[in-house]
Amino acid sequence: MQMRKHLRLTAALTAGCLVLGALPCSALTVSAADFSANYAEAMQKSLYFYECQQAGPLPDWNEVEWRADSTMTDEVTGGWYDAGDHVKFNLPMAYSASMLAWGLYQYPDGLEKTGEMETYVNNLSFVLDYLAACDEGDTAVYQVGNGQMDHTWWGPVELLEYGMKDNGADYTKARAALRGTSSAVCGEMAAALAAGACALKGRSDKTGDYLKHAENLFRLADETRSDDDYNNSDASGFYRSSHFYDELFYAANWLYIATGEQSYLDKATSYIPNLGKELGSDELKYSWGMCW
């Protein structure tokens, strides 16, 4: 049965390709004038997504009518839930925050034209406040919530505590905060906060605090130069780190931009030999890091 379905599908696709091949080129030409995009609407919907993901006490500017306060007993409230889960994974969260910050830093005029500047700044500040709160000096919170336990229940996060108890799970363990000095996570958090300090300069009175935490988190990441604590935790089943020099490089660059201190540029340069290379080549590996 599966083979017959496969053959029918293949035949249909082949016939479709033959029909397209028989059409004159003029019939397949698409004019650039046929395409139009409302970038302001795309921006609004993107920011709305981040507001859907907000954890903890919701700010009064949150526009998602079906959301309410949640996970209010977390050791560190706020931040974003990951995907459709109820866990706060700081590695992808910090990367997303750094991209938001970079967008504002590089294209402020474009954001002004969309009419979404206030909403953008609000959402960026919301996640940066959380990342700053995760910095505890000699260690950092890199995850809140247990992914394995979280995946045993599907429902609205506002009812998570009841769902966990209904499953016979210990809610306190399900919302435990994981701490460490993982270079990848602390480095990414440092990059997000340093980029945020640059992007929000003149728009927020918190930039000095963001930069202070960025520098400390970078110190932890650089001194540790390991992801063992992170990769041996619940996080490894979801966002395992394969290396950390890319995050150190990324963070050092943003700290140089934010402070102008040569030492950060020197650090960034020193990491380059440790960045991944293409197989059988001396060329830097094309990976997520190429976005910068």
What are the functions of these language-model segments?
Residues 32-292:
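Glycan-recognition and catalytic cores of secretory/periplasmic carbohydrate-active enzymes
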Residues 14, 18-22:
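Hydrophobic core
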Residues 22-34:
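Sec-dependent signal peptide cleavage junction
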Residues 2-14:
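Bacterial N-terminal signal peptides that target proteins for export
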